[in-house]
């Protein structure tokens, strides 16, 4: 959240190579931050203008150190997003199951129909797989090579699991599920947002193919 941050870590291009710069918030101009519209309205995102900002050499990280640091930041944040999406998936499943246990259609609880039970179980299985991947990634994160593979697996599976669970939540709530009044849309928006952070599931699987084969 750029509006609340005291310092900004900015990725820049320096002579054609990536570099990192630490910028104090008070070095920015009064109109440097512009709130962006993102699909998940519970998130805050800002465009930051750095026009006229000057930094000293000790606020700059360049060369191989910058490349390694950027890669490390990418993996750390990917794992954190994956863990958050696992929690979101569990909450989404609980939300859906509560509805299936209370909503009646034709005199029967809709949760008694196999057409709804089976996809709900599929969502739970996908969640358990994602959670296992997140645990494995956290355990092996510092291991050379293995940590990156496990983290990318976790990110891909967590995004897949939450997207599936959120889609089923909207579907099972019927027409109500497509409205702003139903919280199912919040889970789908969070799934879209999380999947897009640091590479979506397809991107992660492509990187995995390069790492493993």
State the predicted function of each range.
Residues 7-9, 18-21, 46-47, 162, ...:
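Structural motif
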Residues 72-213:
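Alpha-helical interface subdomain recognition
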Residues 56-65, 142-146:
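Short, glycine- and charge-enriched coil/turn segments that flank and shape catalytic ligand pockets
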Residues 1, 25-60:
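Flexible, small-/acidic-enriched active-site or ligand-binding loops
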Residues 1-4, 13-15, 38-43, 62-65, ...:
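Solvent-exposed alpha-helices and their adjacent loops that cap or buttress functional pockets
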Residues 3-6, 16-17, 42-49, 75, ...:
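A generic structural signal for well-ordered coil/turn residues at beta-strand boundaries
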Residues 11-14, 22-25, 52, 74, ...:
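Short, structured patches in soluble enzyme cores that scaffold and shape functional sites
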Residues 1-31:
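A short core secondary-structure module
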